Amino acid sequence: VFYKDAPAGKVQWGLSGVHNQMNALAAIAAAQHVGVAPAEAAQALSRFQNVKRRMELRGTAAGIQVYDDFAHHPTAIRTTLDGLRQQVGAQTRILAVFEPRSNTMKLGTMKSQLPWSLESADLAFCHTAGLDWDAAQALAPMGARAQTAGNIDSLIAQVLQAAMAGDVIVCMSNGGFGGIHDKLLQALAVRG
């Protein structure tokens, strides 16, 4: 962290992505505005524990990490995946599993932005139940990198077929996503 063109502190935390960096800088600026030194604010941020459903590690099975994230529209999906890519590097595969569950996503208002939002993922799996639009068609620009399924069990089967040790799976929805996180972890543990 720089303040008045000089180093003022360093934030070391497990959060990734430009959006979290911007939030941290805003917090440091707000703290400075009320009299907290930037170095002290940076040190405090280093102790910050992220909130639930924001790149929350739900578990690891068969060498595969499974995360939960609240991302539920293309910009949030893109931000989450770009941050994860920045964190894990180019060699680690990212499997994005998402449920377009918000009202605007169910209606297909932003469906044309989905391929763009998923660019940082190596593979994408879309749960299509309840949609008023053709997700496979919307994701067609991604080619074989995108798959769709109308129910959770089929979606899990697709992910299991693709997932390998060392991969990172991030499940994104603004709801409970049918308990997919625990179901994936159990299925991965059984599969080995």
Feature names for model-found ranges:
Residues 1-10:
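Acidic-glycine-rich active-site phosphate/pyrophosphate-binding loop
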